[in-house]
Amino acid sequence: MSVAPDGDARTPAGVRRTLPTTLYFDVVTIGSRSFLRETYDLVIAGASFAGLLAAREAARLGASVLVIDAQAIGSGQTSACATTLGALQALGMTGTVQQVHREMVIHLEPASGRQNDPLTFRLPYPFATFDYGQLCRNLAADGVAVGVEFARARVTGYDASEVVTDRGRVRGKLTIDAAGWRAPLATSIAPAHVRRDHLSCGLEAEVPQPLRSPASGLHFWAGHGTIWPGYAWAFPAGAVTRLGVLAFPETGGPVSANGSSKSGTMGTVNGASVGLRTALDRFMDGPGADFWSPDGGPPWRRSDTAPTTGRHLHGGFIPCSPRQPVVGEVICVGDAAGHCFGLTAEGIRAAMTFAVRAGQLAGGVGSGRWSASDARAMYWRFATMRRPYFTLLNWLQRWLATLGDTGIRLYSEAARPGPIFWFLMSQYRWAADPVPLLRIPA
């Protein structure tokens, strides 16, 4: 299976798994209950990265698995879709890779408007942008091949050891909440599980790359001359590029796209989406203009039309503060557990890592190797061991939000020397790396 080389703007050739047209079964009634069975070894709420991967790993070990989601597989993208190439290779998902990146580039944008030379960091291991829909469909197809069942329903809570949906109830020996930042199962048990004041908010457009001058590398813009506290980004992905803006919750009040607390409406996270579109337009019309094209031809040039006009945008809230990994009888994975790194807001790799482990533990429940209670305890220990790193990055995010442009520049330059950056990146990978888990038996 081939992988797109650095800077290659072509979608790589790869295995395209085909989903059956009857992926979702019609919910049926068995006596007073719905669904095909009364009890599964594992019931999962949510069919994005975390839920699909946990389902695949559990079913591979012989567990009976049900995945419940109201949306079609591969729809509802909220991610910028970049992770380590090694993670995609270990999952058998290199066919979804759109472009490989070996550099990270930081563009500092001070409020003064003075341009600084970009800081280029050579990555010690490659990252890749990938096709969200295809990855989800591939994972689902893998799951179907090992017996995973899917039901289309809206999950509303957890009660009396049963997952409650708008189409009935179903019981699992083990239950996973992988339904996103809202965590409907966990919050039905512990309403304070979700802290809205800890949520960042992002908005992104996927637009054509200028194919005659495609970009490479993962690009970030930071400073009081752009959205701050937060950042903007451009992630080239083959024929397209993803440009977005992110607002951290540490604003403390309305913040504009140019960093002013009075001249715009960036908003705290609870109202950030109102100003994010304006911030995204300013970014696409300014620093990000060279990275995209309206039609794949020349790069964008400023006009009277806002860049996002008529375009589909995606995004949402990002929980960059770790939550409890187990709530009552429910295991939380991915955004439901706050498994997004502070500062970078990367969540895909963490979702994959914790999903693999949760799926392996569920497989042990299905085989009788251990009890559901033991599985929850083992998952709690696994998550707790990694929690300090997530807490550290959340603290760094809050600390950086207090810095001026000089402080941001000094911090960025301090991390640039090769040995320092490589050490930081080795720790960054260790905290959430699915590769070792996929190389060892459960």
Q: Positions of the model-derived regions?
A:
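Glycine-rich FAD pyrophosphate-binding loop
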Residues: 59-77
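Predominantly flavin-linked oxidoreductase catalytic cores and closely associated redox partners
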Residues: 142-299
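FAD/FMN-dependent oxidoreductases across multiple families
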Residues: 249-362, 366-370
